[in-house]
């Protein structure tokens, strides 16, 4: 129930959820196509002329709504930030069910994937658009806070005995993995960036960071994680298990 509430809450923020592309206002169509092109081609490789051509409008018409690519990137980032802020502040509460935590992480990864151009080369885009540097860093801290909250919950119910310093290190590792997962996979070049399995592989990778801290529950935890991964994806991650797991 918590997961579906989160999905509805997130969807409610988005614009034009039930509106077809043809019904969108020109400004919203520009934003939609810009995001599509940035994700597909990479933001540095797309010009405002490319966007206008894709929309079959004049560059002047595009300029009427956005005075340049900088304004477009800022608008897209603001939308990304607003929605991600809600997601990161609403982690699954009071639930130890693997499915709940799995689908919460799926929502996190799916939202990042929808704006993956921001993550393709983080340092470059922050250098090019200084106005998003501070809020982007804030999001990274929020990822750490969300991860820390989940780890503290596990300790509170006695699943793990990890101390505060260990929780801080684990939360940082989780935030690091989430932030650079798409970039890492893109560098491997083994599959198209839109592959859904990429998201489930990312979730499994994050959960594998938590498993070593669960003591006797480690094997059961990862067995459940692998079972969910096999059910929802195509098991693209090598089926290696943590030490002590089944052969």
Model-derived segments and spans:
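C-terminal peripheral helix-coil segments that are non-catalytic and often amphipathic
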Residues: 4-18, 183, 187-247
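Amphipathic alpha-helical packing segments from all-alpha helical-bundle domains
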Residues: 131-157, 165-183, 200-212
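Secondary-structure edge/capping motif, primarily at the C-terminal ends of alpha-helices
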Residues: 88-91, 119-126, 154-158, 185-189
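Short, Lys/Arg-enriched anionic-surface-contact patches
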Residues: 18-27
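Hydrophobic alpha-helical connector segments
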Residues: 75, 89-117, 134
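N-terminal positioning helix adjacent to the helix-turn-helix/winged-helix DNA-binding module
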Residues: 26-33, 170
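Short, basic, alpha-helical segments at the C-terminal edge of helix-turn-helix-like DNA-binding modules
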Residues: 78-84
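Helix-turn-helix
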Residues: 29, 37-71, 75
């Amino acid at each position: 129930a918590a997961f579906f509430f989160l999905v509805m809450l997130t969807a409610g923020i988005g614009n034009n959820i039930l509106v077809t592309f043809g019904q969108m206002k020109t400004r919203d169509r520009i934003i939609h196509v810009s995001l599509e092109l940035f994700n597909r081609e990479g933001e540095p490789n797309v010009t405002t002329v490319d966007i206008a051509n894709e929309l079959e409008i004049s560059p002047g018409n595009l300029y009427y709504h956005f005075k340049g690519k900088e304004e477009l990137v800022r608008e897209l980032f603001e939308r990304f930030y607003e929605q991600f802020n809600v997601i990161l502040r609403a982690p699954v509460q009071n639930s130890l069910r693997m499915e709940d935590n799995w689908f919460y992480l799926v929502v996190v990864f799916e939202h990042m994937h929808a704006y993956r151009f921001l993550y393709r080369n983080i340092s470059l885009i922050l250098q090019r658009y200084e106005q998003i540097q501070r809020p982007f860093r804030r999001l990274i801290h929020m990822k750490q806070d969300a991860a820390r909250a989940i780890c503290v919950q596990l300790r509170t119910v006695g699943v793990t005995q990890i101390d505060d310093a260990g929780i801080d290190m684990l939360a940082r590792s989780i935030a690091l993995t989430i932030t650079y997962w798409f970039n890492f996979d893109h560098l491997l070049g083994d599959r198209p960036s839109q592959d859904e399995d990429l998201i489930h592989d990312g979730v499994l990778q994050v959960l594998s960071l938590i498993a070593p801290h669960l003591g006797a529950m480690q094997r059961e935890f990862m067995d459940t994680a692998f079972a969910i991964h096999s059910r929802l994806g195509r098991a693209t991650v090598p089926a290696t298990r943590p030490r002590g797991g089944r052969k």
